[in-house]
Amino acid sequence: MSQSTATYINVIGAGLAGSEAAYQIAKRGIPVKLYEMRGVKATPQHKTTNFAELVCSNSFRGDSLTNAVGLLKEEMRRLDSIIMRNGEANRVPAGGAMAVDREGYAKSVTAELENHPLIEVIRDEITEIPNDAITVIATGPLTSDALSEKIHAVNGGDGFYFYDAAAPIIDKSTIDMSKVYLKSRYDKGEAAYLNCPMTKEEFMAFHEALTTAEEAPLNAFEKEKYFEGCMPIEVMAKRGIKTMLYGPMKPVGLEYPDDYTGPRDGEFKTPYAVVQLRQDNAAGSLYNIVGFQTHLKWGEQKRVFQMIPGLENAEFVRYGVMHRNSYMDSPNLLTETFQSRSNPNLFFAGQMTGVEGYVESAASGLVAGINAARLFKREEALIFPQTTAIGSLPHYVTHADSKHFQPMNVNFGIIKELEGPRIRDKKERYEAIASRALADLDTCLALL
């Protein structure tokens, strides 16, 4: 198939991946037609028409270079990521993590793209895959039915799917502050989380209520398949009575403060279990329940989650919801630049490619956008080295075993191992991997 001769590039979808791709293309001097159907047609989960809206958590996760997603974020900053830049400008306290005011952040991304002289924003639903120009499809897991059919046809089948869910958000003014305390785990960074401690008796009662609560029904013909990083709390609870104690209710590093006067188990310094609340907006008026993605019916959410100490009278401004995520058979369909193997003028980006997470989705848009621009200019594709986070992620999703392929977060396990003797200390090993990654990335920057 010959390369398109159009004078612009299409980007379909203005989520995290599409917004990043559009920006990366436009900053290279190429006109972009950015299509977004919200404003004309709503999705079940989005609440606004803003670009790059965060529909689940407001956290971009860990910020340390000894954390793989922290390394990926630093690489993206060096590549001038619009998502990272606007995220930094709209940060809210989150200890050692990076969390944002979701509304302020999305509004700032939207304004920057709408005001870019080379980006034409078109609010319309796309139901056919364009063949008039190089095109980046970044319509995400909530792709409209009409376009999904066309994508599935291009991909030669139905692809794959899994379910993920969003956590509830509550009004801070309705929290009983006498029963909670402010602290970050291991006192990392500033104290940024409200912690709701539970005694063993409270936890056992909560676990019983959670595992017997009524869930909202799925379509009868679909099995329940979840991505481990966004598993509903009730599904986790049913795996075992202590499963949550090693997950979102882990008490380690969250000792009672000296001035805590609420219920506790004897003289123990650490609660039996802890539910953490994270600030959700810059004003600090909204908090989400960390790790409590759920598919319970709304009435059940209110009943069960008000058993959490401090939340007995909490007002829920948004209940948890669950949605179906579709993703492609990327190992068979895409190259490391997220380019279609069967149609070189077609790129895909975002969760539909099998990357999982906000940061990972934006990173895939960055890679696809850079390479769509390079194809437009008839330049050689840029494949980031596997020693970097931003190179290892596309390599993994396009080289995994297709039969067992599932969405993947960035992690040190997919980054190329260090040469020489293995560094036994994990922190030192991750620091060495990060140092090598950033040095190798700087070499790539010279090519851009």
Swiss-Prot record:
Subcellular location: Cytoplasm
GO cellular component, as recorded: cytosol
Signal peptide: none
A GO molecular-function descriptor: flavin adenine dinucleotide binding
Alphabetized UniProt keyword annotations: Cytoplasm, FAD, Flavoprotein, Methyltransferase, NAD, NADP, Transferase, tRNA processing
Record-linked HAMAP family: TrmFO
Protein name in UniProt: Methylenetetrahydrofolate--tRNA-(uracil-5-)-methyltransferase TrmFO
